[in-house]
Each structure stands twice: as structure tokens, then as C-alpha cells.
A protein has these predicted regions:
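Beta-barrel outer-membrane channel/assembly domains of diderm bacteria
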Residues: 2, 22-103, 260, 345-364
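Sec-dependent N-terminal signal peptides
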Residues: 4-17
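A generic structural signal for short coil/turn motifs at secondary-structure boundaries
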Residues: 11, 50, 84-87, 162-165, ...
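Exposed, low-structure sequence patches enriched in small/polar residues
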Residues: 36, 97, 148-156, 160, ...
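Surface-exposed coil loops of outer-membrane beta-barrel proteins
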Residues: 44, 108-178, 198
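Residues that act as N-cap/strand-start positions at coil-to-secondary-structure junctions
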Residues: 58, 94, 136-138, 213, ...
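A short acidic, glycine-rich active-site loop
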Residues: 70, 131-135, 302-304
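A short acidic (Asp/Glu
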Residues: 86-89, 121-123, 203, 243-246
Length: 365
């Protein structure tokens, strides 16, 4: 028996050694850098539900990693931030990224602290605003994705706040999916976006605990008539509760129509929301901890969806295109916005660069 066990052990060690050798033979060194610049000028003097301000920042993310067996990666990176016009601080902040990535034709998985842009879901401005995508660009947790011939599905868990004296405990679960009803032309589709956000206390703040769920099923159609058209109809249902002020969940809801027309990178994007105030705690239920309401700490979407006038309309005219072998992207647009009380506008300019080089670590025989 002991001889048999020794032989089995030696066999397992040999197999593991062979696999390790094969993995090392396929190993590559990854070296790269990401760059993002974001300019966001908002003119909301006549609007009740938006604040006039200018956001202007840049982010450089050098990164290094290893790849093995074609599908596996370990990556370490550092986000280096600078706010334009702030000459008193060299770097506004520096935040790490460390993550494992598995990416095959059908399945992808991530664990650690990884870029939000790895998400495939079409999360609208209701859940994630343009500024949140830039300034909160990391997911701290795990994510799984399935990529099929007729659509995709994904789910992620983001532990975005640690329980301590300096921060509140916060975590967000997001999921999205899309299914193309006609597989040949891929014109008609249906999908959903989902977000569950738990906004808890800290060691210094024991109240103001919020639970928030948002569900956004939609149907859409894509077609070409000289221009590329994409039309989507959404139904938004939310469940929200401030535990200190409400015994039951508030359930604001609404509908949204999206129409996009594009050609040669130039696009017009029309978005019309009709419904209830989707952000009931944004300005209300003031407390000592949040004298002006919970604001953007609780809501990641555009503040205009907190309108009490049952309407929000935004029209974007812009240009969005990749250059130089899909290594540099320019996205800029001018937007007119109406919240039921007045008109406002904003101008967005974003520039992104994605560079990545892989270097084989094994010598070819």
C-alpha cells in the first residue's frame, strides 16, 4: 500500500511539473499604460436639479503583468490622478489596481481591484453617470461574464467602502445581460440592467443606513437607413429605503426612450425620461451626517433623474471614434438638458489611450 501511494504521489508531482513547464513556456510579460483625460463643463443656472461646475482631470495608469496559458493574466497597475488647475498638489491621489483575469471566447472572470471598463453592460445614466465612470473607475471585488453567440450576461460585486472611522461600509452588486432575438440580422434585442447598493454606517456614524435596488429591463431595435439607428425603450423600477426614516420601501418608477443616430463617428443621442423621482433621498431626509441630503454618495447616476417634475430630457450631439489601430479614443459632445424647471447644457471632452505590449518569456526552440 505504501509503495502504491508513493507511486501515485510521484505521478501527481510529475503531472503538476509538466503543467507548470507548459505554463512557463507560454508565459508572456505584459507592459502597458492607460491614459484618460476628462473635461466636463456644466451650465445649470436655470435648472433646479443640477449644479453648475467644471470637472477637469487626467489619469495615467502604468501597468505590468504576466500572461500564461493564453487565457490567464495577473496585472498590477497604479492610477495616478491630477486635477487640472490645482498647482498646489503634484498628484491628487494614487490608487492601485491588482487583479487576476481569465478571458476565453465564452467566459471571463476577474478578481481583485480591476478597471470598471471591463464591464460589458450598457448601464445607463440612471445607474452610472459619465463622471462616476471616470472618477470611480475601479471595481473592488469579483466579476463573471458569459459571452454567447446571441448575447451576454455578467454579474459583479464591488466592495467600495470599508467599515472604519474614515469611511462607511458600502458594497454594490451589478448585473446586465442582452439577448438578440433574431440571430441572423441581430436587429431586435432585449436586455436588463440591475444594481443593488448597500450604504451602511461607519465607526463614527451608526445611522443613515440605506438599501437601494434598481431594475432596468429594456427592448430595442438596431437598423441602418444611411445612418445607424439604435432605439431602446426602458422600464425602470426601484426599491429604496432609508432605515431611519422609512419602515417600508419607496418604489419610484418610470419609463425612458433612447434614440441614437450615428455616421462616421458623428452621433445624435436623444434620451427622454418620464416618471417619478428616482432619487428620493438625494436632497431630502437631512441629518447631522448629511445636512444637505445623501447626494452623490448614495446615487451614482445623473442627479436630473431626481426631478419632481416627472420629465427629464437630454439631447447630445457629438463625435466618438477610435484612432491609430484602436489605441486612442476621442469622445466629445454638447448636451442640452431639461428637467421640467429649466434648460441647461454641458460640454464633455474625453481622450483615452490604451497601450499594451506582450513579450514572450520563453525561447522558441
Amino acid at each position: 500500500m505504501n509503495s502504491f501511494l508513493r507511486k501515485m504521489l510521484l505521478c501527481c508531482i510529475a503531472i503538476m511539473g509538466l503543467n507548470a513547464t507548459q505554463a512557463q513556456e507560454d508565459m508572456k510579460l505584459l507592459v502597458g499604460a492607460d491614459f484618460d483625460m476628462y473635461f466636463d463643463n456644466r451650465e445649470y443656472v436655470d435648472c433646479k436639479f443640477g449644479e453648475s461646475q467644471t470637472l477637469f482631470s487626467s489619469r495615467l495608469t502604468p501597468k505590468v503583468g504576466v500572461e500564461w496559458n493564453k487565457y490567464n493574466r495577473l496585472v498590477a497597475a497604479m492610477d495616478l490622478w491630477a486635477d487640472h488647475g490645482n498647482n498646489t498638489v503634484v498628484l491628487a491621489k494614487a490608487r492601485p489596481q491588482f487583479y487576476y483575469e481569465f478571458d476565453s471566447k465564452k467566459v471571463a472572470a476577474y478578481a481583485g481591484i480591476f478597471p470598471r471598463e471591463k464591464m460589458m453592460g450598457d448601464y445607463t445614466d440612471i445607474m452610472v453617470s459619465d463622471s462616476m465612470r471616470f472618477y470611480d473607475n475601479r471595481v473592488q471585488g469579483v466579476m463573471g461574464q458569459y459571452k454567447g453567440d446571441r448575447g451576454f450576461a455578467e454579474i459583479s460585486a464591488d466592495w467600495c467602502g470599508m467599515y472604519s472611522e474614515a469611511s462607511r461600509e458600502k458594497f454594490r452588486i451589478m448585473s446586465a445581460g442582452r439577448y438578440y432575438i433574431d440571430n441572423y440580422h441581430r436587429r431586435f434585442y432585449a436586455g436588463y440592467n440591475f444594481s443593488m447598493f448597500h450604504f451602511a454606517g461607519s465607526k463614527l456614524i451608526h445611522d443613515c443606513v440605506n438599501d437601494q435596488l434598481m431594475l432596468d429591463p429594456y427592448v430595442g431595435v438596431r437598423f441602418n437607413a444611411f445612418l445607424d439607428f439604435d432605439v431602446k425603450l426602458h422600464y425602470i423600477q426601484t426599491f429604496q429605503r432609508d432605515r431611519d426614516n422609512d419602515e417600508n420601501y419607496r418604489q419610484p418608477k418610470g419609463g425612458m426612450l433612447q434614440l441614437r443616430m450615428a455616421k462616421w463617428g458623428v452621433y445624435i443621442d436623444e434620451q427622454l425620461y418620464l416618471g417619478e423621482n428616482l432619487q428620493p433621498y438625494y436632497r431630502s431626509y437631512r441629518s447631522e451626517a448629511f445636512p444637505n441630503g445623501y447626494g452623490g454618495e448614495l446615487y451614482g447616476g445623473e442627479s436630473f433623474f431626481g426631478t419632481t417634475e416627472h420629465i427629464y430630457n437630454i439631447t447630445k450631439v457629438g463625435y466618438d471614434r477610435w484612432f491609430f489601430g484602436n489605441t486612442m479614443r476621442v469622445n466629445c459632445y454638447f448636451a442640452m438638458q431639461y428637467d421640467g424647471t429649466g434648460w441647461g447644457n454641458k460640454q464633455i471632452v474625453s481622450v483615452s489611450v490604451r497601450l499594451l505590449k506582450d513579450i514572450a518569456l520563453s525561447k522558441k526552440k
